[in-house]
C-alpha cells in the first residue's frame, strides 16, 4: 500500500518546487506513473486476498477503488489545464496541491484498517473538495453549492461518530477485519435499530440516496471539471464502500431496517431517471443520472447477497469511469460554447466529428449496452433484487428503459439537430482531450473482458 501512498505524497513537493513551465508536465507524468504502479494491487497474492499491515490493508473490495482513484488523478490534472489557463502560477500550484491532498486522503480512506480512521479520513476529504468548488467553480452559486455539500455531509455523518464510539465501548475494537470475522459482534437490544440508522445515515447521504440527494446536482453543476470528476468517480464511492464494510457487522441484528431503504432506493431510481428526462442543463442531467445509478448500488448493498455485493462493487467502478467521461465531454462543450444549456450547444457533430464518436460511446456505456461492464453489474443487481422480491423487476426494468431514453436524449440533443449561429466559430479539439477520453474508455473495455478484477470480496 505504501508503494502507492508515498509517491502520491511526494507529488506535493514536486508541484511546489517545479518551474511554472514544467509544473503541468511533471505532475501529469508522475501521476501517470503512480496510476500504472497502482495496477499491481489488483493482483492479490495471498489466499485471503489481503495485503495487510497494522495501519493499511487492501482486499478485493478496496483494490479496485484504489486503482480508480489513482487512474483518475492524471486525467483530472490533464482536464484542468484549460480551466486554469488565466490563473496565476500560485493559484495553479494551490489547485494541484488540493487535488493531490484529496487523493492522499482518499487512498488512506480506502485502505484504512479501522472504522474510526476511515471516519476521520472520510471527513478530511470534505475540506479540499469544498475549497475546489468554492474557489474555482464557474458561477456565483458555487458558495451555496459548497454550503449544501458541507452541511449535508457533516450532519449526516455526526450520528456515525456516536455509533462508532458506542461500538468501541461495547466491543473494545473498531478493527474492520476483527469485527467482520466475529460472529454476531453486537448484542441484540432495542437500541440496535437506532444504531443501524446512525451507522447508515452518513453513507446514504454520501451516496446519495434519493431524498438526501439535493446537494449533489448543485455541487456537480457549480464545481470545476476536476471537482466534478472526483466527486462523481470517487467521493460518492466512499459511501458505497462504507455501506459494504459496515453492513456485514450490523447484519444479523437489524435486517428489517434495510427494507424501507431498499424500497426508497428503487423508487428513487425511477424518480431521478424521470427528472433526467426534463433537464435542460447538461451537467445537471449527468448529476441526476449519478443519483439513479447510486440507487442501484444502495439497493444491491442492502439486500446483502453475494450477487448483490458483486454487482454493487462492479457498478461503482463502471459508473466512476462512465460518469467522469460524460462530465469531461460536457466540459469540452462548455469550454467552447460557454454554456451548459443543451438547446444552445446542439448540432456539434458537424463541427467536432471525433468528439461525437466519444459522446456516442460514453452514452452507450451509460445506458448499459451489452457487453459493457455497466450491463454486467446491472444484471447482477437485478438478479439479486429479484431474489429478494419479484416486484422489484418491474421497477428495475422500467429504470433500465428510462436510462436508455435519457442517455439517447442527451446524445441527440448535443450532437444532432440544426447548429446554432455561435457554434460556427467553435475551436477544434486538442489531442489532450482525445487522450483523456481514450483513457476513460480503455479500462471500461478491458474490464468487460475480465470483470472478475472488480467483483469484490464476494467473488
From Swiss-Prot:
Its main location: mitochondrion. It catalyses: a ubiquinone + NADH + 5 H(+)(in) = a ubiquinol + NAD(+) + 4 H(+)(out). It is found in: Mitochondrion membrane. The chain crosses the membrane at residues 22-42, 65-85, 96-116, 117-137, 146-166, 194-214, 230-250, 256-276, 284-303, 308-330, 350-370, 391-411, 435-455. One of its GO terms (biological process) is ATP synthesis coupled electron transport. It comes from the Eukaryota. Keywords: Electron transport, Membrane, Mitochondrion, NAD, Respiratory chain, Translocase, Transmembrane, Transmembrane helix, Transport, Ubiquinone. It is a multi-pass membrane protein. GO terms for cellular component: mitochondrial membrane. GO terms for molecular function: NADH dehydrogenase (ubiquinone) activity; ubiquinone binding. InterPro entries: NADH4_N, NADH_Q_OxRdtase_chainM/4, NADH_UbQ_OxRdtase, ND/Mrp_TM. Its EC number is 7.1.1.2. NCBIfam families: NDH_I_M. Core subunit of the mitochondrial membrane respiratory chain NADH dehydrogenase (Complex I) that is believed to belong to the minimal assembly required for catalysis. Complex I functions in the transfer of electrons from NADH to the respiratory chain. The immediate electron acceptor for the enzyme is believed to be ubiquinone. PANTHER family: NADH-UBIQUINONE OXIDOREDUCTASE CHAIN 4. Belongs to the complex I subunit 4 family. This is NADH-ubiquinone oxidoreductase chain 4. It comes from Tachyglossus aculeatus aculeatus (Southeast Australian short-beaked echidna).
Amino acid at each position: 500500500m505504501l508503494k502507492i501512498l508515498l509517491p502520491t505524497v511526494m507529488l506535493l513537493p514536486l508541484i511546489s518546487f517545479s518551474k511554472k513551465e514544467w509544473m503541468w508536465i511533471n505532475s501529469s507524468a508522475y501521476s501517470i506513473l503512480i496510476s500504472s504502479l497502482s495496477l499491481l494491487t489488483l493482483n492479490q497474492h495471498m489466499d485471503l486476498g489481503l495485503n495487510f499491515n497494522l495501519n493499511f490493508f487492501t482486499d478485493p473490495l478496496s483494490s479496485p477503488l484504489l486503482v480508480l482513484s489513482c487512474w483518475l488523478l492524471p486525467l483530472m490534472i490533464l482536464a484542468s489545464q484549460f480551466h486554469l489557463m488565466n490563473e496565476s502560477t500560485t493559484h495553479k500550484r494551490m489547485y494541484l496541491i488540493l487535488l493531490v491532498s484529496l487523493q492522499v486522503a482518499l487512498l488512506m480512506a480506502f485502505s484504512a484498517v479501522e472504522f474510526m480512521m476511515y471516519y476521520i479520513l472520510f471527513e478530511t476529504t470534505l475540506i479540499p473538495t469544498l475549497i475546489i468548488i468554492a474557489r474555482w467553480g464557474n458561477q456565483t452559486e458555487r458558495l451555496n453549492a459548497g454550503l449544501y455539500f458541507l452541511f449535508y455531509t457533516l450532519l449526516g455523518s455526526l450520528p456515525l461518530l456516536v455509533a462508532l464510539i458506542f461500538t468501541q465501548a461495547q466491543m473494545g475494537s473498531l478493527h474492520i477485519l476483527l469485527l467482520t470475522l466475529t460472529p454476531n459482534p453486537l448484542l441484540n437490544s432495542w437500541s440496535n435499530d437506532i444504531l443501524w440508522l446512525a451507522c447508515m445515515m452518513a453513507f446514504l447521504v454520501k451516496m446519495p440516496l434519493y431524498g438526501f440527494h439535493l446537494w449533489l446536482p448543485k455541487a456537480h453543476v457549480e464545481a470545476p471539471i476536476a471537482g466534478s470528476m472526483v466527486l462523481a468517480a470517487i467521493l460518492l464511492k466512499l459511501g458505497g464502500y462504507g455501506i459494504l464494510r459496515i453492513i456485514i457487522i450490523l447484519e444479523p441484528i437489524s435486517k428489517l431496517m434495510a427494507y424501507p431503504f431498499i424500497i426508497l432506493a428503487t423508487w428513487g431510481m425511477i424518480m431521478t431517471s424521470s427528472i433526467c428526462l426534463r433537464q435542460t442543463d447538461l451537467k445537471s442531467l449527468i448529476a441526476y443520472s449519478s443519483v439513479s445509478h447510486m440507487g442501484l448500488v444502495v439497493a444491491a448493498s442492502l439486500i446483502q447477497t453475494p450477487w448483490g455485493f458483486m454487482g454493487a462493487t462492479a457498478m461503482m467502478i463502471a459508473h466512476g469511469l462512465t460518469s467522469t467521461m460524460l462530465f469531461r465531454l460536457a466540459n469540452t462543450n462548455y469550454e467552447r460554447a460557454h454554456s451548459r444549456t443543451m438547446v444552445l450547444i446542439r448540432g456539434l457533430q458537424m463541427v467536432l466529428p471525433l468528439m461525437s464518436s466519444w459522446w456516442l460511446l460514453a452514452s452507450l456505456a451509460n445506458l448499459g449496452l451489452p457487453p459493457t461492464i455497466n450491463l454486467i453489474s446491472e444484471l447482477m443487481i437485478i438478479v439479486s433484487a429479484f431474489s429478494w422480491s419479484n416486484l422489484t423487476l418491474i421497477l428495475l426494468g422500467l429504470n433500465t428503459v428510462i436510462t436508455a431514453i435519457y442517455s439517447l436524449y442527451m446524445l441527440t440533443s448535443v450532437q444532432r439537430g440544426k447548429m446554432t449561429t455561435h457554434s460556427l466559430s467553435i475551436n477544434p479539439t486538442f489531442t489532450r482531450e482525445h487522450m483523456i477520453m481514450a483513457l476513460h474508455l480503455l479500462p471500461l473495455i478491458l474490464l468487460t473482458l475480465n470483470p472478475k478484477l472488480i467483483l469484490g470480496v464476494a467473488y
